[in-house]
Amino acid sequence: MNPLTFAMILLTIMLGTTIVMTSSHWLVVWIGFEMNMLAVIPVLMKKYNPRSMEAATKYFLTQATASMLLMLAIVINLIYSGQWSTTNPLNPTASIIMTLALAMKLGLAPFHFWVPEVTQGIQLSSGLILLTWQKLAPISILYQISSTTNLNLLLAMSILSVAIGGWGGLNQTQLRKIMAYSSIAHMGWMTAIMVYNPTMALLNLVIYILLTTTTFSVFMLNSSTTTLSLSHMWNKTPLLTTALLMTMLSLGGLPPLSGFLPKWMIIQELTKNNSVIVPTTMAITALLNLYFYMRLTYSTSLTTFPSTNNMKIKWQLNNTKPTIHLSPLIILSTLILPLSPILTLLE
């Protein structure tokens, strides 16, 4: 793709998301979502082949359906309230329909089926945009309507998402699918706390984006797409492999790494609100996520691919790609937990 064209497309994606996040008029919010969706499709098809074409088509059909539901919710709310403003409380029916539309856009269970399929069919860089930037707009609207959202609906979807996100990733060997299922599980954690403490959901989103960006950056640096390709990494880049190991364990939510912080805070907040069964169920199902990340770390660092080369480091295959941006990302992805006392400000 022409660099100028690609830059314009990325600018449109950012503009669409910014419009959604800053607008106070429901019609403008809907237009922002449409701009964002239509601009991201060429990014998904950056490397043109039948697989990416299929992924982009699946993405378009899902997002178009979600946009239709979103517009239906906006119209129902307009009929009952006569207001276009996003600051006014939503009608209960409109709120349920809008929650379902946003769940479809986020890939929450039971609307999650498109996420692994689309992520698997596109490049790693496009997958990074899909699983990080594309979550910002729907989460921001969910944040705005959190006071009128149906709590039982959100909790049911969040428990299902955490369970499916863990269960679906167990037998996978494709890294993109594993990251997609991880994304479904993380979205489940975010929606569980959205009604009780929306600010904490945003904290979870920031940490999730940080961890996912770091993991994808390492995958892109080594062109890794399967668990088998991870076993080659130790010979080429041992330091980077160690960093990836820590980041993946952090994504799984293992203490004392950064990924444990949002889970800990969410479980604490839900328990404070006299909800014990929900956090207990989510904590148990989160172990599935941790298990498949432990499998990944095993294939990354504890297995060495058979080689006829006696040298421990393959110096002739030195990577020339820039890695300067990875240093702060890796530090933030693994060492945020000591800052947790500051987060009492959220309460």
UniProtKB/Swiss-Prot annotation:
UniProt record similarity statement: Belongs to the complex I subunit 2 family.
A single BP term in Gene Ontology: mitochondrial respiratory chain complex I assembly
Membrane spanning stretches: 1-21, 25-45, 59-79, 96-116, 122-142, 150-170, 201-221, 242-262, 274-294, 326-346
Organism: Eidolon helvum
Function text: Core subunit of the mitochondrial membrane respiratory chain NADH dehydrogenase (Complex I) which catalyzes electron transfer from NADH through the respiratory chain, using ubiquinone as an electron acceptor. Essential for the catalytic activity and assembly of complex I.
SUBUNIT field: Core subunit of respiratory chain NADH dehydrogenase (Complex I) which is composed of 45 different subunits. Interacts with TMEM242.
GO molecular function, one term: NADH dehydrogenase (ubiquinone) activity
Highest taxon of source: Eukaryota
A Pfam family: Proton_antipo_M
Localization in the cell: Mitochondrion inner membrane
Annotated membrane topology: Multi-pass membrane protein
Keywords, in A-Z order: Electron transport, Membrane, Mitochondrion, Mitochondrion inner membrane, NAD, Respiratory chain, Translocase, Transmembrane, Transmembrane helix, Transport, Ubiquinone
Its EC number(s): 7.1.1.2
Reactions this protein catalyses: a ubiquinone + NADH + 5 H(+)(in) = a ubiquinol + NAD(+) + 4 H(+)(out)
GO cellular component: mitochondrial inner membrane
Protein name: NADH-ubiquinone oxidoreductase chain 2
